[in-house]
Amino acid sequence: MRLIHIPALESNYIWLLADSNQHCVIVDPGEASPVESVLTYKGLLPQAILLTHHHQDHLGGVPQLLRRFPDIPVYGPKETNKKGATILLKEGDQLFICSQTFSVIEVPGHTLGHIAYYSAPYLFCGDTLFSAGCGRLFEGTADQMYDSIQKLIQLPDETLICAGHEYTLSNLKFARSILPDDPQIALYQKQAEQLKAKNQPTLPALLKLERQVNLFLRCKESFLQKKMGTHKHDPLSVFSTLREMKDRF
């Protein structure tokens, strides 16, 4: 399988997963033109579109793509029913496309109906989990987002996180403000800066590394709890406080 990232809009990534037969799956096409360009250049034929949630920057390209490829199915959560999805999905559903099995994981938080798709080793998680960060709580609660992330971190270390935005450097800047002396975060920030200087993506990110550099995955660590100065040492309170701090950062 070939994983292809397509920069779109201001900070989005659209993902393509292609097989040896030149067939591919399109994930979260926020706009159509860059997708069409890549499909033409690489000679790929889409077999399906996968949507993670209903925000326009993740599905704005669906109508134009369907005009060109009218027969391909569009999968998504219930909240995308009126946004182009033709087949609605829920927790536990499985899709078999391009010789790959995609498992559906419900991950409410960023939106109430947000889902992720896992096809080892790839995790297409939209705006739930970013490298060194997590999504804003536009509709859901901190409890929901925390539980969603707990689901995702049960996946194997070699999981590749294919997030919906290139937010890595800003997330690492926030992480350094909390843990300025953390060597892993400092090293990853340097590596991310080098990639940006070469106009290269920081994604996909390895889940094994995220366990070390993503504060939102480290809420059970007593060291982080003390560093934040929170008097509530339960992981959910730490997560909620971190999310509020990031919103103000």
UniProtKB/Swiss-Prot annotation:
Quick check: keyword Protease in the entry?
no
Keyword check for Lipoprotein: no
UniProt keywords, alphabetically: Hydrolase, Metal-binding, Zinc
**Annotated binding of Zn(2+) 1, by residue:** 53, 55, 110, 127
Q: Give the E.C. number(s).
A: 3.1.2.6
Gene3D superfamilies noted in UniProt: Ribonuclease Z/Hydroxyacylglutathione hydrolase-like
Q: So, what pathway does this thing act in?
A: Secondary metabolite metabolism; methylglyoxal degradation; (R)-lactate from methylglyoxal: step 2/2
Q: Which InterPro entries match?
A: Clx_II_MBL, Glyoxalase_II_hydrolase, HAGH_C, Hydroxyacylglutathione_Hdrlase, Metallo-B-lactamas, RibonucZ/Hydroxyglut_hydro
UniProt GO BP: methylglyoxal catabolic process to D-lactate via S-lactoyl-glutathione
- What does this protein need as cofactor? Zn(2+)
Quote the cofactor binding remark: Binds 2 Zn(2+) ions per subunit.
Q: What's the catalysed reaction?
A: an S-(2-hydroxyacyl)glutathione + H2O = a 2-hydroxy carboxylate + glutathione + H(+)
Name one molecular function that GO assigns to this entry.
Answer: hydroxyacylglutathione hydrolase activity
Instruction: Locate the residues binding Zn(2+) 2.
Output: 57-58, 127, 165
- Top EC class, one word: hydrolase
SUPFAM superfamilies named in the record: Metallo-hydrolase/oxidoreductase
Function in brief: Thiolesterase that catalyzes the hydrolysis of S-D-lactoyl-glutathione to form glutathione and D-lactic acid.
Give the family per the record.
Answer: Belongs to the metallo-beta-lactamase superfamily. Glyoxalase II family.
Assembly and binders: Monomer.
Name of the protein described by the UniProt record? Hydroxyacylglutathione hydrolase
